[in-house]
């Protein structure tokens, strides 16, 4: 599993905090916006395109509020993403929705919460079963 992470200018500092945390916990992390000053549309699309290359990939996009990146990610065919600002939602969106990407806002969550969100998201696993019906419905919309 590779975790692709990216941010716009407003999310750079928090993205770096999360990236460092994930690397310290032995995750394979690729920063697709390192050294770049992008808006949330371009930074999110950079994450989405990498995530979609392999079913095992995950993505995290950070902007000021998380909403912009969420809107962009969910416009891409086949992408199931969630805007999260708490650990439980990050975990549940993996286990129930089979989300492969989350977005969060640097103006909404602090460093510790962002680390915990990332931890729960990457440690979550899709439960399948009764949840597959909804995932199939989402995929059928594309």
Curated annotation (Swiss-Prot):
Pfam family, one: LacAB_rpiB
Metabolic or biological pathway: Carbohydrate metabolism; D-galactose 6-phosphate degradation; D-tagatose 6-phosphate from D-galactose 6-phosphate: step 1/1
Ranges annotated as spanning the membrane: none
Known catalytic reactions: aldehydo-D-galactose 6-phosphate = keto-D-tagatose 6-phosphate
EC number in record: 5.3.1.26
SUPFAM superfamilies linked: Ribose/Galactose isomerase RpiB/AlsB (SSF89623)
InterPro entries per record: LacA (IPR004783), RpiB_LacA_LacB (IPR003500), RpiB_LacA_LacB_sf (IPR036569)
Keywords of this entry: Isomerase, Lactose metabolism
GO BP field: D-allose catabolic process; galactose catabolic process; lactose catabolic process via tagatose-6-phosphate; pentose-phosphate shunt, non-oxidative branch
GO molecular function: galactose-6-phosphate isomerase activity; ribose-5-phosphate isomerase activity
Disulfide bonds: none
Keyword Cytoplasm on entry: no
Primary enzyme class: isomerase
Keyword Acyltransferase: no
Domain of life: Bacteria
Subunit description: Heteromultimeric protein consisting of LacA and LacB.
Family, similarity comment: Belongs to the LacAB/RpiB family.
Protein name, UniProt field: Galactose-6-phosphate isomerase subunit LacA
């Amino acid at each position: 599993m590779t975790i692709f992470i990216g941010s716009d200018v407003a999310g750079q500092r928090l993205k770096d905090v999360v990236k460092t945390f994930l690397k310290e916990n032995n995750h394979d992390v690729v920063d697709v916006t390192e050294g770049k000053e992008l808006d949330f549309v371009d930074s999110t699309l950079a994450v989405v395109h990498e995530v979609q290359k392999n079913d095992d990939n995950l993505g995290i996009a950070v902007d000021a509020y998380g909403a912009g990146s969420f809107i962009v990610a969910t416009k891409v065919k086949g992408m199931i993403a969630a805007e999260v600002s708490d650990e439980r939602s990050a975990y549940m969106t993996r286990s129930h929705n089979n989300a492969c990407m989350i977005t969060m806002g640097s103006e909404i969550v602090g460093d510790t919460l962002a680390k915990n969100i990332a931890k729960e998201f990457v440690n979550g696993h899709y439960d399948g079963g009764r949840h597959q019906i909804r995932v199939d419905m989402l995929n059928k919309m594309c």
